[in-house]
Amino acid sequence: MSDTRIVGKLISTAARSSLQPIGLARKGRSRLWYDDRGWSLIVAEFQPGRGPGTYLNVGAMWLWADRDYWAFDEGARLYWRGDGSLRTEPPLGEAGWTQHVDFLNADQFSRDVALAAEVAARRVVELRTQFPDVAAVADHLLSRATRRAESPLWHAFHAGAAAALGGDAAAAERSFAKVL
């Protein structure tokens, strides 16, 4: 069996063990798992890299924009340590953080990707807690500036949509005015 197939099987096993028990479903036979909340998705992606292994992306996708692709509107790449602690921003200048699980052999990868899947599950729970409803999304988006590499128009659109759906017409109007 090729390294790529072994990696895929081990990711599937680890994700099934950590993500399925908390309610995530797998998209077909892909490396993508999701929690459908009706108005949003929480997405966990074991992203392939150049060689055998995986990166880990976990974030929320708002469903009020009509798209035919998966997106990370809030969150994405995760960084973690061997003790399971995690960050959503690159920890510059600090040793011991990783963002990629390299495949060296099946035993090592199985152990390391199991930790990554546990980190993904913990981040999913954090996002569920952070965004229990649309009003919480609106509060969050309205209170933060547009991030680097984020489109100001998409940020304003998402803030406006969340505010409108959360019942704050004035905030929705202010946000949508930035889009038009």
Residues covered by each model-derived region:
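Intrinsically disordered, low-complexity regulatory regions enriched in serine/threonine/proline
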Residues: 1-7, 33-180
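Acidic carboxylate-rich catalytic motifs and surrounding loops in phosphoryl-/glycosyl-chemistry enzymes
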Residues: 28-32
